[in-house]
Structures are given as C-alpha cells and as structure tokens.
Amino acid sequence: MQESSQEEPVHYVQWFYLSNYDLYDETSSMELTGAQSWRRFLNYDNNALEAKYNEIITEEVSQEPNQKNVIVGISGLHVVNLPTLTLKPLYWPSASKNDTLRVVRGLWMYEDTGLPVINELSDMLEEGYQEVKPYAVNWDNVLKEEEEGKDSQDDPSVLSHKRNKSSKELIDAMQWPLKPTSSGKYVFYEDGYRALICQGGLLSYFSKGTQSRRTSIKGMPVVRDFPYFEDDGFNGPKQVTDLFLVVHGIGQKRSETEERFLFTKTCNVFRSLIQIQKNIMKEDPLIRNDYEPQLLPICWRNKLNFNSYIKPVAGDEGRVEDEEFEENRFSIEDIEIDSIPAVRRLLGDVMSDIPYYMSHHKESIIKSVIREANRVYHLWKDCNPYFLENKGRIFIIGHSLGSTVVFDILSLQPTFVKEITIDDDESCFIFDTNGFFCFGGPVGFFLHLNQQSIIPRRGRGSSRYEINKNFINSDVPKSYTYDGYDRYGCLAVDSFYNIYNHLDPVAMRLNPTVDLSFSKGIHPTRILFTRKSSSILRMISHSNTDPVELRSYNQSLQQNKNNEPTAVVPLEPEQTVELETRNFRREERAKWRMQELNENSQLDYVFTSAHGVISNKYLSMLSAHSSYWSSEDLACFLVVETGRNFGIANSIEQFRGKHMPRIFKGDSS
C-alpha cells in the first residue's frame, strides 16, 4: 500500500495510438484488415511525445504548426499532431482510414485490461483527482481512529486534509461526479493511484464490479499509473542509407481519391516486401552491413486536373468568340462505358496515359512530379540530417508512364546539382539520382518516337568510381558519351534498370535502344529467387524449390581462373545470331556503354508472376501491369542490387548480361 503524502506522487504517462498495425514492425504493410486496437508508443517516442506535450501546455514551444508535431515509428514515416491528437503519414497525403489514427495520452488506464481511458473521461478523472487530492489521505489512520472512537482532530495528518470529518464523510469527500451529472455516475478515489468508476442511485445495488479495498463501494477500477518497461529495444528510427522515391503513372479514373489511395497502398505493400527481403539477406556476405533501405511515394497526380480546359484566345481559328456561347465540357468518366470494368480500367488508367502525356498536359505533369519529389526530399532532408552527412543514395522507381516522366526529367537534369532551396527551380530535381528503376514503362516507344538512343552522361556511370578502374576504362573517345543535359536519352544517373513482367502489355525492352546490333546477342536477365512455397498449386507448378545461390562477379572470375564451371541461372535456350559484318569498333563502343549504364552490362530484366497450374496469358496480362508491387522476387532483386557491396567486382553474376554465341560472315568456324 502506498504511503500518504501531501505532494502528488510521480506517475508514468503512457501514450497510445489506435491502429490495426504496429508502427514498430518495419515489415508491416500498414494495410491490414481487422479491428483496430490500442497500441503503446515505445519509450523513445513516448518520452518525445510527453516532452513536447509539456512544452505546449507551458507555452515553451513556437506557435508554428510543425513545432507541435512529433515524428514516430521505427521508420520515422508518421507524425503525431498534439493539438488534434492524430497520427498521420509524414511524407504522403492521408487517403484511407488506416492513414489517420487516433492518439491518446494515457494518464489513466483500466486496471483489468491495461488499456487507456479515453480522453474525455480521462480529463474528468484528472479534474476530480486534482480537486480531491486523494494522495493526501492516510486511510489506515482514519479507520484506526474510527475503531478506537478517537477524535480525528487529534491526528494532524487528517486535519490537514478534511478537518472534523468522520470516515463516512471522508468517503463522500473522495467522490467526484462525472458528466453528465444526470447519469448519476461518479468516481471514488481510493488513494493516489487507484479509483473506481461507480453507478449512482438504484443502479448501484445491481451493478457488478470490483469492490473497493477501503469500503463496500463497487465499480470499474482505473489506475493513474502505467507500467514502465526499462528496455524495449527501440532507440529511435533507423538511419537510412538508400532511399527509393516511387513515381506512379497518370491513372485517369477517380484520380482524386482512389488512384491516390491505391498508389500509397501498393507502395506500403512493396515497402513491406523490401524490408522482409532485407531481413532475409542481412546475413549474406554480399550485402553491406550498414544497408538500410526506405521507400516513399511521390503523390503528384492529385495536384493536377486533366478535366480543365484551355481558355480560348481571341482570334483563334475555329473558336467561337461569342461570350454567350456555352462550351460543352465533359470528362473521361462521362464518356466511359460501364461494361468489362477490368479491361476498361487497364485501358482508361494505363493506355490513355500516352495520349494524355503527348497533349498540352505534358509540361504540367513534369512540373508536378518535380515539385512533389523536391518537396518530399526537402522534408526528408530536414527530418533526417544524417542522410546528407552519411552520403545517402537516392534511387527513383518509375512505374508505367511515371517511368517515362522521370526519363524526361533525368534527360534534362544537370549532371550534378548543388543544394538549392525548394522554391528555386521547378525544372529539375534538387538532388542527384544514383539509380533509376523503370517498372513496366513505355520508354522505348518515346525513344523510337524521338528517334533517339540511350547514351551515357559524361561524368556519370560506372567509370567515375575508382573501385571500377580495373573493369572499365574512363579514358574513352568523346563519342562514347554525351556531355550536356539537353539530349533525350542521356540520363544524369549512375545506373539504369528496365524491369518488366513478360506479360505486361505496356512494357518494352531497352537494350536495343543502346545498340541494336549488339543487343541481339544479349538475353534479358531473369529475376529469379525460387523459394519453398506454402501453396500446393505453386509447389506443383514450380518443381525447383531450392533457393538460388548468389555469387559476385569477382567470385566467378576466380572460379574461371581455377577452371571451375560457373553455375548461372538458365536464361533461354542458346541461339546463334548471324550478323552481316562484324564491326569491332562499334561492338567495343556498345559493350562499354552497356557497362557504363549499368555495372551488370545489362538494362533489361524480366520476371514472371506466380501462377497456378492453369493460367492464361491473355487473362494474366490484366494484372501483369500491377504485379510489380507484390513480387517478392523483384523486391529481393532491389535489395541485392542496392544493398550489395559497391563496384563491378561485387556485381551479382546471375544478374550480369549474358552474350549468346554469334556467327559472323567470314568466320571459319
């Protein structure tokens, strides 16, 4: 039993959030179904929330809105706004019920469940606690005096609290009415740590509850103290080494709501897969010890309105200048037919991207992507100052037409950018991009349309790193690269990947856009990490359940020196390609460019979605374009490629471009 004291006892305050996922589980997709429950913030975040709360109530904090926020979670992706007691995503807009969560400052909790008392009731309990001051009562002395028939005025400890009060009167004094008063409910404070929420009137005779340790009163017990866990293993968000920014396509249907929601949802799922694969691979010697990836969506689409019309200019041919003439304005949704929704969704949200991007909307699309990416990066840099100090790397993932938009931006991006403020320019990213991953994009179509090839940017690429000097020569003819940022297809990146599902109707190969002749001898690399499956259908359809063993390029070279065969993932049946003539100079240039654009000497990577025993490629194509976000193989590929040790020597042998045997005219073989 606690000793009585004239001073209020020290209590541990515990903050909670109402959610169906765990902020401290980095593998959570944040899109779980099921009922929400109260979860506690771990000590690091809990202390930060309580400190900020005390600053606000004592007016020691700035009145700026951002100064009343606290970043929380193992990944630091969410923020608690203390005035509103809500938890929201920090880097992307809230678009679903799982995005905006309720937060409570747990000063009082239910003794039976350990859950916090809701804010309104907690405030009433605390108001009564401060008025009654139950911690100042010594119940042992009161009851002892009652039994011995002594005058309570002889005891100064009781006099100081309630002079000339009998034990019955003291019990009444320890009660505090709860609003609304018509309900008859009240709280009975037993001491400085425990109280009972009780029913008044006739209901008190029929109520079932816990009996007070002091009197015959029954009620629901609540306590003003939470258990403190000395070490919960969380010491703040992890320090990220590699940041992925994901840019989506246009997506016309319901763009203001569903499109934005679906995009953030798929990013949450893919982030979860990346974290799972990182944990699986963390003991692999090929992966850097400090590797810590993070993925953020770039939600640029909700800033644009494609249903807006260009205001007619006086004198335009074909324009009716009569102000009384009312234009007939309609949107895509107005002319869309309701039949075959799955197919029309693909056509409406994907296929229509290309004509939209080729219209007058192109410039506004590019600026919107740049503006949102710069905003997210600027916020990331402010919240994670260590990222620049540790020279963190940035990778961009572009999906569908989003890859084409990013391709346009990186073609006009300066080779290197200096730190500028977010308002300085909307023409380029305010950060340097280390690598660009194209997911199912029609980039090849636009290269063909512009009659341009992919060419390395001078000063970027594999050859600029000292660690690669034994594998690629940096002293090459000027024609091998392009010096400037005014050429379509010349990207300001060090590595470029074109990844596609082989059933994706939108995706295109890009190896031929570097050199058509040379690309005929290169197979696209298959992304394949076969694992044991829990599905009977997958076990039947995939006979090989042994995981693929990864090896570095350097290990393979060493094995070749020792005359040991190099085991690689089988790609396609070997073919021979007949060329008219063998141009050694062109072949050498193409080989150098492929190595410069990607340390694997390969741009094209293909994967296959998991199917059962029976599958139809024409039906599968409807889901193939969105299959990237649920592919474990693709997530593992990104982890390996961005998490492996630096340099060509440490590139993965299975991912390197493989050349088919070729026969040239004039060969004697």
Curated annotation (Swiss-Prot):
Reading the lineage from the top rank, the first entry is: Eukaryota
The residue ranges of the DDHD domain are 463-644
Q: What is its EC number?
A: 3.1.1.-
Q: Which residues form the active site?
A: S400
Q: Which UniProt keywords apply?
A: Cytoplasm, Hydrolase, Lipid degradation, Lipid metabolism, Nucleus
Q: A Pfam family name for this chain?
A: DDHD
Biological process, per Gene Ontology: lipid catabolic process
GO CC annotations, alphabetized: cytoplasm; cytosol; nucleus
Alphabetized GO MF terms: metal ion binding; phospholipase activity
Q: What compartments host this protein? A: Cytoplasm; Nucleus
Please tell me which top-level EC class this enzyme sits in: hydrolase
Major localization class: cytoplasm
- Which family does this protein fall into? Belongs to the PA-PLA1 family.
What biological function has been recorded for the protein in this entry?
Probable phospholipase that hydrolyzes phosphatidic acid.
Q: What is this protein called?
A: Probable phospholipase C1020.13c
State the species of origin: Schizosaccharomyces pombe (strain 972 / ATCC 24843) (Fission yeast)
